[in-house]
C-alpha cells in the first residue's frame, strides 16, 4: 500500500475566499510509472477546513511479466464540474442569463427588419414580372402595416399573460414562415397580401414581447443599454437587408431573398429553444423568479383581460404623453423610410444606385448613436440624475435634432446634394435617442404592464405607416413640393411632440389599479 498526501494552496482548483461555499473538491489522478512497477491509484480529498486525507490507496495487481506492454500515456485529470476548464467552457457559459436573453432578442430584431425591408427591394423585379402598377405595389407594401397595427394590443396582452419570451419566439416563427410563403403566393394577390399581413402580425407582437422581457429581467440602471441594444437591432437589420438583398437577387432571383431571410428566422427559433432558463422578475431592487403559465384556460384568459386596468391607463397624463410622442416619432420615421430614396433620386438628382446606398446611411449611423445614447442615459441615472429628467433629455434630442436638420434641408440656402444628405443622416441618426427616452418609459412607470403600455402606444404609432405614407404621396402630387409634403408635417409633429413630452412625461413608477377602472 502506498500513501500519498497532497496539500493544495492557492491554486486554480480551490480558492480560500470561497472555501466556505464548497464543502470539498475531489480530484482523481492515476500516476504512470515504469512498466515493471505497478500503478498507484490515489484519491486526494481537499476539505473546506484545509485538512486532507488519503481515504484509499490500493496497489493494482501486477501484469503478466511475459507481456511487454507499451508505456502508458498520462491520463488527464477528471475535474468536477465546478473546477478547472469546465468552469469557463464554453466561453459564454458564465455570462448572466439575462444578457443571453437580451442578445438573442436583439438578433431577432435584426432579422425582423431584414424581413421588413426585403420587399422594398424585391418589389421592383416583382412588379416587372407580374405587371403591377405603382398603386398595386403600394397596396402590397402597405399590407404589412395592417397586420402590424392590429397585433400591437394583443401582443402586449399575450406578453402579460404568457411572458414576453414565449410571445417573441412565436412571433419570430410566424413572420419567418410567412416571409418564406411570399414567392409561393406572389401570383395570387389575396394570398400575397395575407402573407404580408402575417409578417406584420408576427413583427407587431415583438416590440411588446421584448419590452416585457426587458422589464422582467433588467434592472433600471442597465435598462437604457438593454433597450438600445435590443431595438438597435432594427437599424442593423435595415442595413443588412438593404445590403444583402440586391446581390442575392442579382445572383439568384427575387424569390431567394424571401427563402433565405425566412430560413434565418426559423434557425433563430430553433436556437432560442436552448435558452430554457427561467425568467426573473425585478420588483424594486430585488429579483424573484417568475414562471408563466402556458396552459391557461379560456376563462383565465378572459379574466386576465378584464383585470387589466384600461381606464386607469387612460387617466394617466404620462400614458397620453407616451401615446402622442410615439405617434409623432413614427410619422417622421415611416414617411422618411418610405420616401427618402425617391427624394434623393428626384430632388437631389442622384442616380438609383447612389440613392440606394445613401438610404443606408441613416440606419447605419443610428447604430452608433444608439450605443452612445444608451451609455449616456445609464451614466446619468447611475450618477443620481432623476430618471424622468434623463428620459426628457433623450427624447428632446430625438425630436429637436431631426426637426432642425429637416428645416435646413428644406430651405433653399444653396447647399450641395451631399451636404443635404449628411444633414438628414445626422438628424435621423440622432432620433435614435428615443430608445433611451420614450421606449424606456413603459418599463419605468410599470414593469408589470410594460408590454401592454407599449402595445397601446405602438398601435397608435403604426397609424403613420398606413396614413402618413399615403398622405405624403397625395400632398406631393398636389403641391409638387417635397418641403410641404415630406418635411413640414414631420417638423410639425416633432416639435409638438417635444412640447407634450416635456409637459407631461414621467418615469415615476405608477400604480394602475383595477378598482380605479
Curated annotation (Swiss-Prot):
Gene3D superfamilies: MFS general substrate transporter like domains. Expressed in leaf veins and sepals. Pfam families: MFS_1. Coiled coil: none annotated. The chain crosses the membrane at residues 130-150, 170-190, 229-249, 255-275, 312-332, 352-372, 397-417, 420-440, 452-472, 484-504. It comes from the Eukaryota. It is a multi-pass membrane protein. The keyword Nucleotide-binding does not apply. CDD domains: MFS_SLC17A9_like (cd17380). GO terms for molecular function: phosphate transmembrane transporter activity. GO terms for biological process: defense response. Residues 52-70 have a biased composition (Basic and acidic residues). Induction: Expressed with a circadian rhythm showing a peak during the middle of the day (under long day conditions). Residues 51-73 are annotated as: Disordered. Its main location: plastid. Inorganic phosphate and probable anion transporter. Belongs to the major facilitator superfamily. Sodium/anion cotransporter (TC 2.A.1.14) family. This is Probable anion transporter 6, chloroplastic.
